Amino acid sequence: MKFSRAALSIALALVSLALVSFTASAADYPTPKQGDWIAKDFKFHGGETMEVRLHYTTIGEPTGQPVLVLHGSGGSAANMLTPAFGGELFGPGQPLDAAKYYIIIPDAVGHGKSSKPSDGMKTAFPKYNYEDMVDAHYRLVSEGLGVKHLRLVIGNSMGGMHTWIWGGKYPQYMDALVPMASQPTEMAARNWMLRRMMLETIRNDPDYNRGNYITQPRMMKYAINAYGIATAGGTLAYQMQAPTGVAADKIVDDRLALPITADANDFIYQWEASHDYNPSPRLDKIEAKLLAINAADDERNPPETGVTDAAMKRVKNGQLFLIPASTETRGHLTTGNAAFYKKQLQELLQTAPQRTM
């Protein structure tokens, strides 16, 4: 329970808290089931090999068409069970109706109840990257759950980046791909600069003590909130919510008043894992029908750079759906609300050819 609260605290610190006014239907899908699987002799990109515990959540029955759902940085499967996401997708008649689909939501390596530094190894835990995390997903699904083929891989933010990797690394394993709040290009520019500044702030806190801290570094709260405000929330939404200095201060005060119960080593590993992300070399290998979903006001993946548009030309069966910016969108957080794109997702599933199952 400790770790699920930690992940939830990170998520709350990075979103607009009470300011996020997404409306969604109540969850009326089957009760999620929890499980664990041990990946023996898991090899990390640095060469280290060890057993890795992979926690996962499933909704629906194994007889349904398998769908892999991937969460964002610092989160867990719980982040995909919100009314705004799961409540819009997993219920009767919805795009991923659990009566038809077998929904698999892993806790990524380093996250939730899967193996991570805070389990005891601290900084001796192998450094992992997004390729490692996707390989762990693949082993869980193929070996642990015995799934031979996926109908869909869908992911948000970090999960969106994982989805891009999935498509190029295991191109015949799925029928459809929906990477969200992400772009299929090298982690760089302001997105990485701000990530690095957040991590450097935590590392250079004397409390951190090279990962051998007794209490969590005090500066972690400020680093996380600075990054969250700078890279998520939406320009128009913030202007509406904080049109005065007093209102802006209230938002900051409310965020800083929230406890950050995440473990610093876990947090650093989670975000540093994105440093060498670059699915670009494999884009030509993607075979599945792909629907990329981004928000026009996404601070981390700004569409005006043109890099996603250029990359999409290399995806044989790909298209991009850009959610227009408004006071209802929340920048990078927009895709957490499936109401913005459930129609497009439904159309994808109706038209994507069903290959081997």
State the predicted function of each range:
Residues E131-R151:
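Conserved acidic catalytic loop of the alpha/beta-hydrolase fold
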Residues E299-G306:
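Conserved alpha/beta-hydrolase "acid-adjacent" motif
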